[in-house]
Amino acid sequence: MTHALLVAIPIVLAVVAGCSSGSGSATDDDGDGGLSTTSAPEDIVVEAGDFTALADMTPVRGFFVANLRGQVDEAVAVAESPDGGVYPVGTVIQLIPQEAMVKRAPGFDPDSNDWEFFTLDATAEGTTILTRGGSEVVNGFSGLSCASCHSAAEPEFDFVCEDTHGCEPLPVPDDVITSIQLADPRPLR
């Protein structure tokens, strides 16, 4: 079982979340003939302490969603929408405690739809970031870029993989994923 988990964790992590970029700045008619400018959302820099126990996040069909800017409702609405959408900056998506993806501001990494990927060490003391970045983050066991797996997601799902989003199915049974999720050692906040 331990060997299966060691093989399954990196595979699951490489296939997990999603991403999409928003627009830069737009100029809109404000209704009175004048123009107003809206700008891209400010970027967010993630620290190890930003990653919480999965049980502190909102579960959606087997993965977990949070937002570091307090936009949990907006992030969950995108995750639950059958039509997809673009996740707000600061959205955290995790399938298992050892990997995460965080939506960054437009321009962070267009190749990964502006998602930053993380490999994590989750312990009872908290989380340590092992690796982070865009499409260069590689799953240690599969040797594949996290972004390469997520790029198969249909565009409307913002780089988030699920059974109906165009991605290859995970080569790990759901019960193994659930057992990894339930073994998250991080304390609740």
Predicted segments, located by residue:
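Sequence context surrounding c-type heme c attachment/ligation sites in exported
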Residues: 22, 41, 48, 84-189
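Core hydrophobic alpha-helical transmembrane segments of single-pass membrane proteins
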Residues: 11-13
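Generic detector of short alpha-helix boundary/capping microenvironments
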Residues: 6-7, 78, 137
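C-terminal motif of bacterial Sec signal peptides marking the signal peptidase cleavage site
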Residues: 15-18
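Short, low-complexity, disordered segments immediately C-terminal to signal peptides
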Residues: 20-39
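Bacterial N-terminal signal peptides that target proteins for export
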Residues: 1-9
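Intrinsically disordered, low-complexity peptide-like regions
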Residues: 1, 26-30, 148
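N-terminal secretory signal peptides
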Residues: 33-86
